[in-house]
Amino acid sequence: MVKRYAVILAAGQGTRMKSKLYKVLHPVCGKPMVQHVVDQVSKLGVEKTIAVVGFGAEQVKEQLGAQCEYALQEKQLGTAHAVMQAAPHLQNLEGITIVVCGDTPLITAETMEALLEHHMTAGAKATVLTAIADDPTGYGRIVRNSDGHVEKIVEHKDANEQEREIREINTGTYCFDNRMLFQALTKVTNNNAQGEYYLTDVIEIIKADGGIVSAYQAPSFDETIGINDRIALAEAERIMRDRICRQHMKNGVTIIDPACTYISAEATIGRDTVIYPGTVIEGKTVIGEDCTIGPHSEIKNCHIGHRTSIRHSVAHDSEIGDDVTIGPFAHIRPLSKIDDEVRIGNFVEVKKSTFGKGSKASHLSYIGDAEVGADVNLGCGSITVNYDGVHKYRTKIEDGAFIGCNANLIAPVTIGQGAYVAAGSTVTDDVPGRALAIGRARQVNKENYVDRLRGKKKS
């Protein structure tokens, strides 16, 4: 078995992005573009993956961690110069090296695997991944010989009229015999207008030395798009989003309007779940089977069980069980845990709280820093008053408690098992189990008050 290696070019600053964030760290569907590339390369069975880093090296290393070894390109002097920085890691090894740009997040493991296999079958020393472009302006053109191998790569500015008609372009992804690659790199010069060392010159050197230079055509130009500005970033986002939605639909998820649905690359969704338009599913969210999500809901890093409905609502960094109903217009804030068969209704905010099985907060409530037991009913306008201006305090509501409408529970406080809190109460002390707490002023009716009031106004 021939050993495989990978070099990922991730040193560019990306000035056209006009951003403080380094280019390869810009996210596509929630994942940095270089992470997309590394994740796909990891499926190829490579012995080593070398990430060539430069601008933002520490941030790139922090993102990729132990998935890669690293080579530093201190000065950006061209693509051949970048690959040369990987020499201490690879130059004396036998095998095949694939070179991929870190700003091509749409490339797939399937296409790279096909490139590697074609390289072996063709007996090539170098193989170029090509693509057919509708508009090849600005790309290097692939000129093939009668055997179908690469005769030369002609840059757009150097191409004659006939060559400019060619729509097969160089994508910037290559496969090389590893030893020959690093031998050829020592012969590359910077005798050009930009004074840079170009990897395309390696192709010419290998060909001049008698090596076969082959080409493998990618199934879709979209896979090969390089991200150099925000316009290309948005296009890659659109393509990736469509790809993600299609994969979920193939797996049994109904997405009513994929064009109006955002699902991160790391989300998992069970079959027979329905996603309505305007829904945003971010991070490593897991959604079970037979759920209804949306319309217009935002879910981030949540774990959601089966048969749960979330409509017109926001949920972040929380656990939500089976058969739960959330919304419309509810907000589940981080570190909340909602057990099975719970209802969180309209205009209810839950913050860093737990709800036991079967409990309900159906309307206009704030439940923060609370432990709510099972089968608890929180009436309209229930508030856990958790903040005194300096510290946060917790409220505990035990199983079966009933909290009347417009009740304020001043934390720290415990409402005992099966206890009742009367509507309109402000509760400052613990309530024993099965007791009724009434914390409000007694009603006083003033007879004939309105007549006296109106009489004063007339006079």
UniProtKB/Swiss-Prot annotation:
UDP-N-acetyl-alpha-D-glucosamine binds at residues 9-12, 23, 73, 78-79, 140, 155, 170, 228, 333, 351, 366, 377. Residues 252-459 are annotated as: N-acetyltransferase. It catalyses: alpha-D-glucosamine 1-phosphate + acetyl-CoA = N-acetyl-alpha-D-glucosamine 1-phosphate + CoA + H(+); N-acetyl-alpha-D-glucosamine 1-phosphate + UTP + H(+) = UDP-N-acetyl-alpha-D-glucosamine + diphosphate. This is Bifunctional protein GlmU. HAMAP family: GlmU. It is found in: Cytoplasm. PROSITE patterns: HEXAPEP_TRANSFERASES. It comes from Geobacillus thermodenitrificans (strain NG80-2).
